Amino acid sequence: MIVEFFRYGAGLSKGPLDYFLGKKRDREHAKILSGNEQEVAGLIDSSPFAKKYTSGCLSFYESDLSDEAKRKIMADFEHCLFPGMSSDQYRVLWIEHRDKINEETGERRLELNFLIPNTEILTGNRLQPFYHEADM
């Protein structure tokens, strides 16, 4: 698994949502696995913070992970990003992509993309998910 955090995060939700889902929400081989698109967009668009969201991707060599395995990976990743927090304190929109081809196998590569509003839900305070470039 490769983890990549994207450098963007200052704009409105339209940018990352258009990328993840397509401008008309019709990106081929893209589907929402978890989270609420409208809620995440509302949190990002109403954010008073300079960096309104964090986004990135988990990319896999394997193309045949079960839905249960994907759910576990997403939950474990959230647990690492939000240590000590409960799931009612943050929101994550998870979008699966399968539009890139693995050149070695010829199969579609699995990517689990995430979009996180940088707002703590219960307090409205700024929330910056942990990742090494910002926190170490």
Give residue spans per PLM region.
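N-terminal nicking endonuclease/strand-transfer module with a His-rich metal-binding environment
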Residues: 1-136
